From Swiss-Prot:
Record-linked PROSITE patterns: SAM_OMT_II (PS51683)
GO BP terms: methylation; secondary metabolite biosynthetic process
Keyword NAD part of the UniProt annotation: yes
One term of GO molecular function: FAD binding
Compositional bias segments (type: Polar residues): 462-474
Designated name of the protein: Dual O-methyltransferase/FAD-dependent monooxygenase elcB
Native source species: Phaeosphaeria nodorum (strain SN15 / ATCC MYA-4574 / FGSC 10173) (Glume blotch fungus)
Keyword S-adenosyl-L-methionine: yes
The entry's keywords: FAD, Flavoprotein, Methyltransferase, Monooxygenase, Multifunctional enzyme, NAD, Oxidoreductase, S-adenosyl-L-methionine, Transferase
């Protein structure tokens, strides 16, 4: 009966996914007809998720219907050649035997019989035939891996349990006395084949560098931090990290021959990239570590090659090098899952890797508990573990066992970002990953999925759950396990978006010990250019003072740029100064008051201080559901990859394209102002200081180009305006990580002035680059080129600002705005909006960030007050009773009422600036922006 039920479930899943795939292919016409060049990828990238789901279900189906007596037959060699009569003659083998072999391989998809007389390549065989690295990979498996596997039983019988390097199945298979690496060094042909094999392994999805880049918070390290890449071979991993994180420096360590080869490779253009930040050092990791001022000691695919005794020696030398405060060890290696906790296909790959390590090295892949026991023997402890989705390796962050924990709470956290299943599941969509309940109380270790703690101990009075049903889009039925009757405020506040407002709210909650988690769709904090300034007025500074701890607020103040208030206007053609005024009324009761100038990248990093372990990147929300049981209401957020998170409240701080706004207030549409802007920054190099007007480097500078254009006949006068400001930092604070002094600038005008070459699909807001827009080098280069084209007739002194710009920081955006009068929607006790998600505004008023920060502080007060009112009775927490939920809904309604007032003032102030800078029409005349 159980097998029948399993078969039925898998078949239904296959049918459902097949319909989804066929529907997509029918509209997109992506799937190849089967004709044409062999080896062509038949699935588009957009179907990668469904393809993997279908492949996994198919593997499960095969396993369910395979008779045990047939299993070994399926494991017979999937190898062969590519033809029939002619091939038999060329290979000097009997045709009948050849045909039997090839038809067996065709039955397994390795080749394809196009007619009863002809055999051709399949995509798999074509890949081996045309890709030298893949060919060497296949040869390696055939010549070395398979023979070693064949003799595994012989080695076990001969030596039993052993960790000696030359007592392996490999030694029996090759009939050699030396260990694997010794034999490899002596055999040039094998060495070359092994190198190709490793290149092929490294190029696979499961071992891609992208998992290394996203699996650890490299962006949270202080700029200038030193990463020691222990056993880093040719430095390819360090260069990948250097490209993604320009503020970090790397030291690649390996044996002398390897380092010399790596240095020789630096003659290539590709290897010269980041040469100033990636240096090489000869070092044997079995000897004491010579670098003792490193911030991170990184070992990728190193420890799994060695048995425990040897691994302890390696780790002990690194432990002794942890001299710098906060220094850590990061290991990227396989963390074997418990059976059945990952997809069948991924588990198969990991089990094969485990056996290979035993057969060749007498080493092993380790489970989490084995890793924990290993590092504890060295006086280390696991601080954090991350398992990136799609990766065969996880990342273990280690610190000294007797050191103060680097993460809040002091507990190791095991985080899985793949299709993991756990014993305590609250919401599971067809096996997709589930973000489980937020654990409360203190336990020695808490395990989590996607960063939300879960443990059976988090359930008071035992597990008394019962199940309910929730409706999820596109017909998928999700099982929801409702929780036992315990305080709702042990669940976290879910903050969607790691922009300014979302992080400020997170800091407020952190300050008041209210559980929260932040989810950000960007894959990292440095995914897009954000290196330009924000102007914060007194009200915003007050909001920060209310939200941040004293230490973090002091760091904010120390990071502020030196502000000078005034305005200078230049003529774009002659380069002459038209007018200039210090103060300009900005310091009085009108205009900008008591402003702070901050670099947005630095500011955002400060707002992540102390909470980076609660921020999860690469999580894009698609919808939410408000659920109820007999005790309380709670919200379940569903992400693009199928993962879910459960919380006490959901805050949409996810920018102008907010999925939360579209669901909560679908009638609330943003407006297209008709303008486009290019943001940029130009570092104050000696050349810029020599060419750019000195009077333009004192305070805010405005250049208005009102040259008549043919468009003026059609659309009225259409000025192009440059707004720039010098950003200088005080170097009195040696601990502050600040960028070089630079000039912030923005070019803004009616869209008709900008060419189609510009990427204008994103939206700009009142406080900088819109976080909804993905960044890439090509779009940055196009933006920089557009700035030069628009200012081609300008005076050379002014144009030097664009000629010397940091091209990587240029970005072009469409300017959108919410209407000044926001709609009134029914408030509830589970969901609300913040910042650009609800009241995007033109940057011309310079107040978007101010309004967003005040939003965050005011919402934080709501959570703090409700937490305080329920402190005496933890069981009857916020929302725990109907009366509590009603009270929370009333407080949210009051918050949203004040938010509408703030939004009206900010949007109207921005309108005044927009009208002056690019001639914005009235809001009634604007079209709805398609976002």
């Amino acid at each position: 009966m159980a097998a029948s039920t399993g078969l039925s479930t898998v078949l239904k899943e296959i049918v459902q996914v097949c319909r989804e795939v066929e529907s997509h292919l029918a509209t997109e016409s992506h799937l190849d007809s089967g004709e044409g060049a062999p080896g062509k990828n038949t699935f588009p990238i957009g179907l990668e998720g469904p393809r993997k789901q279908l492949a996994n279900a198919a593997a499960q189906l095969s396993q369910l219907v395979t008779d045990p007596r047939e299993y070994l037959e399926q494991l017979s060699a999937n190898h062969g050649s590519i033809a029939y009569t002619d091939l038999a003659n060329r290979a000097s083998v009997p045709e009948s035997q050849l045909k039997s072999v090839l038809r067996m391989t065709a039955a397994h998809g390795f080749l394809a019989e196009v007619t009863p007389l002809e055999i051709s390549h399949s995509p798999t065989s074509a890949l081996i035939a045309t890709n030298p690295s893949f060919y060497d990979w296949a040869r390696w498996l055939t010549n070395y891996s398979v023979p070693s596997a064949y003799h595994f039983a012989d080695a076990t019988q001969k030596w039993g349990r052993t960790e000696v390097k030359n007592e392996t199945a490999f030694n029996i298979a090759m009939n050699v006395e030396v260990p694997f690496f010794g034999y490899l060094k002596e055999n040039a042909k094998m060495n070359s084949m092994f190198s190709s094999y490793m290149r092929n392994v490294a190029s696979s999805e499961a071992t891609s560098f992208k998992h290394m880049i996203s699996g650890f918070d490299w962006g949270g390290l202080t700029p200038g931090s030193k990463v020691i890449d222990v056993g880093g071979s040719g430095g390819h991993g360090s260069r990948a990290l250097a490209s993604a994180f320009p503020g970090l420096n790397f030291v690649v360590q390996d044996l002398p021959d390897t380092i010399e080869n790596a240095k020789a490779a630096l003659n290539t253009d590709e290897s010269k990239l980041h040469a100033d930040r990636v240096r090489f050092m000869s070092h044997d990791f079995f000897t004491p570590q010579p670098v003792v001022d490193g911030d991170i000691y990184f070992l990728r695919m190193i420890i799994h090659d060695w048995p425990d005794e040897t691994a302890i020696t390696i780790l002990a030398h690194l432990r002794d090098a942890l001299k710098k405060p906060g220094a850590r060890i990061v290991i990227m290696d396989t963390i074997l899952p418990q059976p059945g906790t990952v997809s069948l296909l991924q588990e198969r790959q990991l089990r094969v890797r485990d056996l290979t390590m035993m057969q060749v090295f007498n080493a092993k892949e380790r489970e989490y508990d084995t890793w924990k026991a290993l590092v504890e023997k060295v006086g280390l402890r696991i601080i954090h573990v991350e398992q990136p989705e799609g990766s065969n390796m996880g990342l273990l962050e280690l610190g000294l066992a007797d050191a103060t924990d680097l993460k809040a709470g002091g507990n190791a956290r095991l985080v899985f970002n793949g299709n993991m299943k756990t014993p305590s599941v609250n919401l599971n969509i067809n096996g997709a990953s589930t973000i489980n309940e937020f654990a409360h109380g203190s336990t020695p270790e808490t395990f989590a999925v996607n960063g939300i703690h879960t443990t059976d101990k988090a359930r008071p009075n035992g597990d008394t759950t019962h199940s309910g049903q929730a409706s999820i889009p596109n017909g998928v039925s999700a099982r929801i396990s409702t929780r036992p009757m315990y305080a709702r405020d042990v669940l976290p506040v879910l903050i969607i978006g790691a922009g300014i407002s979302g992080l400020c709210l997170a800091q407020y909650l952190h300050k008041h010990a209210i559980p929260f988690v932040v989810f950000e769709r960007d894959p990292s904090s440095e995914h897009r250019p954000q290196g330009y300034r924000l102007k914060l007025e007194a009200d915003a500074a007050a909001a920060l003072r209310e939200s941040l701890t004293a230490e973090v607020y002091s760091a904010f103040e120390a990071s502020c740029a030196e502000s000078a208030i005034g305005e200078t206007d230049f003529d774009p053609i002659s380069g002459a100064c038209i007018k200039s005024r210090a103060g300009g009324g900005l310091a009085g009761a009108q205009g900008l008051r008591a402003s702070y100038t901050v670099d947005r990248t630095v500011f955002r990093r400060i707002l992540m201080t102390g909470i980076s372990d609660k921020i999860y990147f690469g999580r894009e929300i698609t919808r939410y559901d408000i659920c109820e049981d007999n005790v309380q209401s709670y919200v379940v957020a569903t992400f693009k990859d199928g993962a879910t998170a459960e919380g006490r409240f959901l805050v949409g701080a996810d920018g102008t394209r907010s999925a939360i706004r579209k669901q909560l207030v679908p009638e609330h549409k943003f407006l297209d102002t008709g303008a486009t802007c290019i943001y940029g920054k130009t570092v104050m190099t000696p050349e810029l200081l020599a060419r750019y007007p000195a009077r333009a480097l004192r305070w805010m500078t405005v250049v208005a180009d009102r040259a008549p254009l043919i468009q003026s006949i059609l659309i009225g006068e259409s000025p192009l305006t440059l707004l720039s400001e010098p950003i200088r930092f005080s170097r009195d604070e040696p601990t502050a990580s600040l960028p070089e002094d630079y000039v912030y600038w923005v070019l803004i005008g009616r869209r008709e002035l900008f060419t189609d070459a510009t990427n204008t699909s994103a939206s700009s807001t009142g406080h900088g680059v819109n976080s909804d827009k993905a960044y890439n080098t090509e779009s940055a280069q196009a933006s920089a080129a557009q700035s030069l084209a628009l200012t081609e007739e300008w005076h050379p002194s002014l144009r030097s600002l664009f000629e010397l710009q940091d091209v990587s920081q240029a970005s072009t955006m469409r300017v959108v705005s919410a209407p000044p009068k926001l709609p009134v929607w029914p408030s509830n006790s589970c969901v609300t909006l913040l910042g650009d998600a609800v009241h995007a505004m033109s940057p011309c008023g310079g107040v978007g960030a101010n309004v967003a920060l005040r939003d965050a502080a005011e919402l934080g007060k709501v959570f703090a007050s409700t937490a305080a009112s329920n402190e005496e009775d933890a069981i009857q927490s916020v929302g725990g009773k109907a009366s509590d939920q009603h009270d929370m809904a009333q407080q949210i309604a009051s918050f949203e009422g004040e938010l509408r007032k703030r939004a009206f003032g900010g949007i109207m102030r921005s309108f005044v600036g927009s009208k002056a800078m690019f001639g914005q029409r009235t809001f009634e005349e604007l079209d709805v922006a398609e976002l």
